[in-house]
Amino acid sequence: MNMKKATIAATAGIAVTAFAAPTIASASTVVVEAGDTLWGIAQDKGTTVDALKKANNLTSDKIVPGQKLQITEVASEKTEKSVTATWLNVRSGAGVDNSIVTSLKGGTKVTVESTEANGWYKISYGEGKTGYVNGKYLGTTVTSAPAPEVKEETTTQAQAAPAAETKPEVKQSTPATVLPKAETKTETPAVDTTASTYTVKSGDTIWALSSKYGTSVQNIMSWNNLSSSSIYVGQVLAVKQEAAKTASPKAEVKTEAPTAEKQVSAPVVKENTQTTTAKKEVTPQKQTNTQAPAQAAKPAPAPAPTVNTNASSYTVKSGDTLSKIATTFGTTVSKIKALNGLNSDNLQVGQVLKVKGTVPTANTNSNSNATAPTTNTNNNTSNTSTSTPSKNTNTNSNASQGSSSTASASSLIAEAQKHLGKAYSWGGNGPTTFDCSGFTKYVFAKSGVTLPRTSGAQYASSTKISESQAKPGDLVFFDYGNGIAHVGIYVGNGQMINAQDNGVKYDNIHGSGWGQFLVGFGRV
């Protein structure tokens, strides 16, 4: 009898073991079911897509029903970062196709919860709110341990003791509620809006500085002799007019030396004597930047020869005028305006101008030729063969098409330049704020060309061309990993005008944050 019981007990034990085994296996693996995604499984199991792919040697996000996936734990350590852009959009998902939840100001600290496959971060901010941001706009990584330390200080001093090495002063300043304020204010007091100069910090832009100091982008570029809106960390900028002026008397006093007089005889000074008082503010800085190196080393006169008078194009710099450029290249103001389709003498720093070429001449000749064949045709109706006038007619129509195409590109870029410095907003259609495709659609519409609303649709509807074929007025497209997500207007020389997070501005299509995402060009 006892033997029978032992046999039954052993059999029961085997049965229990047989049913228990799958339960243990399911603790570290999961079987994919219809409708499952890596992202959904990661959320359900408290891990990340990257961790799942690494654990299972997956090269893509594709999974199939019945597939077994190994589940691994994710390191619990999180990182704290700060926003480096002026404003950073927080979205409901990892990519620009998701809706904007809110926008965080530059310098705001966030906690990185996880990293997505496309370079986006899931973050937490404020009072436990979460969202997704583009990782390239976050910087200054620190371990996120300080957050719990602040709360522990309010409960027990014994627990807060380890923080004494890094924050002894904070502990002595009693209430823990002071800590967030102290951290927030450490960045703002650094900006003294009454100061006349400012040292550039990470995340700064000329547009943001102009807002802080109550001036314009153009003024800051002018006072600092900047040829583009690019600035670098540590650069000292004049943000008040007096800062630009204080440097000029020193340079003028020392230009009385015979060496300086040779430089003064250049066309630049002739231009300055003829310009209005408003432009005189720009000219002294140009002298300041040119002369200052001369005191340190004699090779300073190098800036003058940098203008290649044999070049066919010229990039506008601070203090330039059409008259000055025409004198430098031995041409006339009217010819430069005709070459570039300009209706006024207004120029923008960074604008690329044609200074040589045959477009105006070709237009003049084509018009005079158009008259000549007409006269000949009328006078020689019976004696001249009809083939000659028809040839002339075709030649003239082709010439007019070429000139109208050039004028169209020039007017399109001129329209784009009108909006430099305007703010970015997702879904912005203009004219006060834009997003990238809203900007291109608006500018092209002003030239009579209708574009689709999104960057992806604009890419699909354009004729694809290589970079060597690209001309000013063509579209340039970028892909951040989930398809076409950004578009700008190409202006030549590797530059584009586009609406991005920092507003409407010039950018180098091969520069940092752009070159690696460049897809190509399109013509409409």
Swiss-Prot record:
Instruction: Please state the Enzyme Commission number of this protein.
Output: 3.4.-.-
In this chain, composition skew of type Low complexity spans 155-165, 284-311
One GO molecular-function entry: cysteine-type peptidase activity
List the SUPFAM superfamilies. Cysteine proteinases, LysM domain
Occurrences of domain SH3b (ranges) = 78-142
Per its UniProt record, what Pfam families does this chain match? LysM (PF01476), NLPC_P60 (PF00877), SH3_3 (PF08239)
- Provide the LysM domain boundaries: 28-71, 196-239, 312-355
Sorted keywords for this record are:
Hydrolase, Protease, Repeat, Signal, Thiol protease
Task: Tell me the segments the record calls region Disordered.
Answer: 145-190, 247-314, 360-410
Does the entry feature the keyword Repeat, yes or no? yes
* Domain called NlpC/P60: residue spans: 406-524
Q: Where is the active site?
A: 436, 486, 498
Q: Where is the signal peptide?
A: 1-27
Per the record, the GO terms for biological process are: proteolysis
> Disulfide connectivity?
none
Q: Tell me the function of this protein.
A: This major extracellular protein may be involved in the invasion of non-professional phagocytic cells by Listeria.
Name the family the entry cites. Answer: Belongs to the peptidase C40 family.
Q: Domain note for this entry? A: LysM domains are thought to be involved in peptidoglycan binding.
What this protein is called in its record is Probable endopeptidase p60
